[in-house]
Structures are given as structure tokens and as C-alpha cells.
UniProtKB/Swiss-Prot annotation:
It holds the Pfam family Pept_tRNA_hydro. GO terms for cellular component: cytoplasm. The active site is at H19 (proton acceptor). It is found in: Cytoplasm. It comes from Clostridium botulinum (strain Hall / ATCC 3502 / NCTC 13319 / Type A). The gene is pth. This is Peptidyl-tRNA hydrolase.
Length: 189
């Protein structure tokens, strides 16, 4: 069983912002596998389904980004999911737009949502899909809560689809295979 968590902030004002990429990827997976994310529990919205023979729980925490660990630990404990089977998808400023990076473990890298998840799990050993949003020329908060330009949106739509495929690959083939397949790929206009 896998817990697939997309990080983001709830509310219309955050829809399609850089910081909500995790929500967008979870929505793509939900659509592909006909999973309705309409149940409220674990301080978030979630749905249950299958990828092949594996049961998956798709989770969108409603705690706001910096407290995402509260939602993740509640769902993981309820379903008794191993940390190695918790996949977290989130935006990453240290990666260029058009790229993603799959990792099996690691530090928070300055991302407060990941920092909170690491604290609650008491471990940094869980797979993650880091989606590049590029470096801001402006205030970081305004940048991550801002929307993509038209040109960026064209690239991001393709990266979101690739990120969903990377999550599916982790479930079907394992994190190492997903890393080999998706790390280093760059999508351009």
C-alpha cells in the first residue's frame, strides 16, 4: 500500500500557483485511475484506489503547507503505511522549470512542508517527487504563491503529467527505476 501526498494550500486563491503543484499532480493521478478525492479525514481530503495490484491513498493535506506533516502522519498511522511507501510531491525552487527530480530520501532543502513531514515521521527516508519551479527574481513568498506565466504554464502542464508518471513508476517499478527514468529529463517549449 502507498500513500501519495500532494503538497499545497487549500483555497481558490492558491489554485494553479507554484506552491500547489503537489495538488495538481495528485489530481492527474486521481483522474487517470478514477479515484475520487472527496473524503475528509487526516486533516485533509483523500481517496482510495489502485495502481495495478497496489492499493493507493491519494492525500491533499488541508493544514496549509507548513503543517503538512500532521496530515501525513495521521494517514500513515491509520493505514499502517511504511515510510518508504509514502510518496510526497512538491514544488522545488532549486530545480529549473521543466525538470523534476525523484529522490528516495533527503533533507527538506528549505521547504517547510517537507521539514514538517520529516519532523512528524521522525525520518527523511521517504520517496519524493520534486517539481522544479525555478528561482525567483522577487520575494520568495510572492513567487511561490504566484501563478505561472503563459509560457511557463505550457511547460508546467507537461511536467505535471511527467510527475504523475514518475509517481506511478515508483509504485509499479520502485524508486530507483523512477529515478533512472525521470531524473535529468528536461521539458522545453
Amino acid at each position: 500500500m502507498y500513500l501519495v501526498v500532494g503538497l499545497g494550500n487549500i483555497g481558490k486563491e492558491y489554485k494553479k500557483t507554484r506552491h500547489n503543484i503537489g495538488f495538481d499532480v495528485v489530481d492527474i493521478i486521481a483522474e487517470k485511475y478514477n479515484i475520487e478525492i472527496n473524503r475528509q479525514k487526516f486533516k485533509g481530503s483523500y481517496g482510495e484506489g489502485r495502481i495495478g495490484n497496489e492499493k493507493i491513498i491519494l492525500l491533499k493535506p488541508s493544514t496549509y503547507m507548513n503543517l503538512s506533516g500532521e496530515s501525513v502522519i495521521e494517514a500513515a498511522n491509520f493505514y499502517k503505511i511504511d515510510k518508504e511507501n509514502i510518496i510526497v510531491i512538491y514544488d522545488d525552487m532549486s530545480i529549473d522549470i521543466g525538470k523534476l527530480r525523484v529522490r528516495s530520501k533527503g533533507s527538506a532543502g528549505g521547504h517547510n512542508g517537507i521539514k514538517n513531514i520529516i519532523q512528524h515521521l521522525n525520518s527523511d527516508i521517504f520517496p519524493r517527487v520534486r517539481v522544479g519551479i525555478g528561482q525567483p527574481d522577487e520575494n520568495v513568498v510572492n513567487y511561490v504563491l504566484g501563478k505561472f506565466s503563459k509560457d511557463e504554464r505550457e511547460i508546467i502542464e507537461k511536467v505535471l503529467a511527467m510527475s504523475a508518471k514518475a509517481c506511478i513508476s515508483i509504485v509499479e517499478d520502485g524508486v530507483t527505476e523512477a529515478m533512472n527514468k525521470y531524473n535529468g529529463v528536461k521539458i522545453e517549449v
